[in-house]
Regions:
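The feature captures the conserved acid-bearing segment of alpha/beta-hydrolase catalytic domains
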Residues: 332-438, 442, 450
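Short, surface-exposed "cap/lid" segments of acyl-processing enzymes
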Residues: 67, 95, 99-104, 161, ...
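Alpha/beta-hydrolase active-site loop
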Residues: 278-300
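Cap/lid segment of the alpha/beta-hydrolase catalytic domain
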Residues: 254-255, 266-285
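N-terminal targeting or regulatory segments adjacent to alpha/beta-hydrolase or S9 domains
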Residues: 1-199, 474-484
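Gly/Ala-rich beta-loop-alpha elbow adjacent to hydrolase catalytic centers
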Residues: 309-318
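Active-site signature of alpha/beta-hydrolase-fold catalytic machinery across serine-
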Residues: 320-324
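A conserved short beta-strand
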Residues: 326-331
């Protein structure tokens, strides 16, 4: 590496969080590095806050006549000077830090010799924006789903333009953080040390391999793979986890399949942890597409060996993957109201039911009976359970897979009866359930036998877990569904 290349690496290089495989995991830094990193963190935090409240700041600035060229120039000069000072201090600090110079040299060599990148950098945990790419997703034809919208352009051009601009600002300033709190810069900063320590444990204790994937959108996906193929029959099955709206693979649902000795591939959604981008529907499906391609083309798993295990809003990328990879082994899964609906349908449209009905393979839904997040009515426990959104998913699956059976109000009522039943009542409802679900003579079934068959199908597609939204899944419920 030439002196010029080294200097450029020190200026643009990523922050190193920690050593992974050393007894002392703390990566050394000097006072100049600490002060400069603090300056950059403060400025980035100010930028994030200002972005969130930008509509109000602009309104205040306009009312006080602050939106003029002189003030813009002063703000630009201050920002540029601030960043130049911070980056210069950081660069000087890195010049006097032999450990960072060693890391910069390792990173430079890793980019020159891509096939050795993982082995060269495996000892460091650092910002992944500068990491070599382990896998690039291919651009292939995919299915995309969109909920039908009732919002169209109106004759009032001014109203439409105002609505679109206002909704865009709300969606990408604070609505995104409400839908996906895991993408909030503040939350990522607060739990950063916890994520770093858990990544180290996955590598050291579980033998995990970290992978950096490039999506067709140009985002980087931070992934972690634990290979158990040499450790028993379950290891030949790869469980791809899809976390919730505040979940990370470092702290999420990976432990459940790992405890049962499955191979596991975890990944972070766009904007979560070290994954780049924003958690919009388009970028999210591009990320899960890259993850599945990585599992097939790089890790060597067949599509039939892959199981998708999703939690909460992770059902959106999970159902998209199921719809686009049909051979996977299994899927587990007022005044402002018009504006809110328009924002969600336009910027955060996640048609989980539509995507799930496009998948015809084996699956099981796990309904959390005490769930406080995915309900639409507060009230008694019976009222909350009746509005659990898992109920709607079950009905969508039944209508799509068994249209001759679920085709009227009586059939839907039979499903509702089963959904509201206690475990003992369900035993009674399904005691005469046929061992083989022969669907050929539905028209000739009596109403009683038809209801028995519906209850039997419900018991195959959905199981209850007596827990709230954030309780880890009980190991006894993590079973690979089979076709029937």
């Amino acid at each position: 590496m030439t002196p010029a290349e080294m200097l450029l690496s020190l200026i643009r290089g990523p922050k190193v969080y920690a050593y992974i495989r050393r007894h002392n995991t703390v990566f050394p830094s000097n006072s100049l590095e600490y002060v400069s990193e603090t300056m950059l963190t403060v400025m980035n935090g100010c930028y994030t806050v200002c972005s969130v409240v930008s509509p109000f700041l602009l309104l205040i600035a306009y009312n006080r006549s602050l939106l003029n060229g002189t003030n813009f120039m002063m703000l630009a000069k201050f920002t540029v000077t601030y960043y130049v000072i911070a980056i210069s201090m950081r660069t000087i600090g890195r010049i006097f830090n032999p450990e960072y110079r060693r890391f910069a040299d390792t990173l430079f060599k890793a980019h020159l010799h891509g096939h050795n990148a993982s082995s060269l950098l495996v000892g460091y945990d650092y910002e992944l924006f500068a990491a070599p790419i382990d896998f690039r997703a291919r651009k292939e034809s995919r299915k995309y789903f969109e909920t039908p919208r009732r919002f169209t352009a109106t004759g009032n051009i001014l109203y439409t333009a105002l609505r679109d601009r206002l909704s865009y600002n709300i969606a990408y300033s604070f609505a995104r953080v409400l839908v996906y709190p895991g993408s909030a810069a503040l939350l990522n900063k607060l739990i950063q040390s916890f994520l770093i320590e858990n990544r180290r444990k996955l590598v050291i204790e579980k033998g995990a391999m970290r992978g950096v994937l490039m999506t067709r959108e140009g985002n980087r996906v931070d992934s972690m793979f634990v290979d158990r193929r040499e450790q028993g029959e379950n290891g030949d099955i790869l469980v791809v986890t899809c976390e919730g709206n505040a979940g990370f693979y470092e702290t999420g649902i990976m432990p459940t399949p790992l405890t049962l000795n499955y191979s596991v591939l975890g990944w972070n959604q766009p904007g979560f942890g070290e994954s780049s981008g924003l958690p919009t529907p388009k970028q999210t499906v591009a990320s899960i597409d890259a993850v599945i391609q990585y599992a097939i083309h790089k890790l060597g798993f067949e599509e039939e060996q892959i199981v998708i295990y999703a939690w909460s809003i992770g059902g959106f990328p999970a159902t998209w993957a199921a719809a686009n990879y049909p051979n996977i082994k299994a899927k587990m899964p007022r005044s402002w109201a018009p504006l809110v609906e328009f924002i969600v349908r336009t910027y955060f449209d996640m048609p989980i039911a539509m995507q799930l009905t496009a998948y015809n393979g084996p699956l099981v839904l796990i309904r959390r009976t005490q769930d406080e997040m995915i309900i639409t009515t507060e009230g008694t426990s019976e009222e909350r359970l009746a509005t659990n959104r898992a109920n709607n998913l079950l009905k969508s699956i039944l209508r799509a897979r068994h249209p001759n059976l679920i085709n009227d109000d009586d059939a839907e009522l039979a499903v509702d009866v089963w959904l509201a039943a206690t475990p003992l009542e369900r035993i009674s409802l399904t005691k005469d359930c046929p061992k083989t679900l022969a669907m050929g003579n539905i028209e000739n079934l009596t109403k009683q036998n038809r209801n028995i068959l519906i209850h039997c199908l419900c018991s195959k597609y959905l199981v209850d877990f007596d827990s709230s939204h954030n309780t880890p899944l009980d190991l006894s419920l993590f079973t690979i569904p089979s076709s029937f």
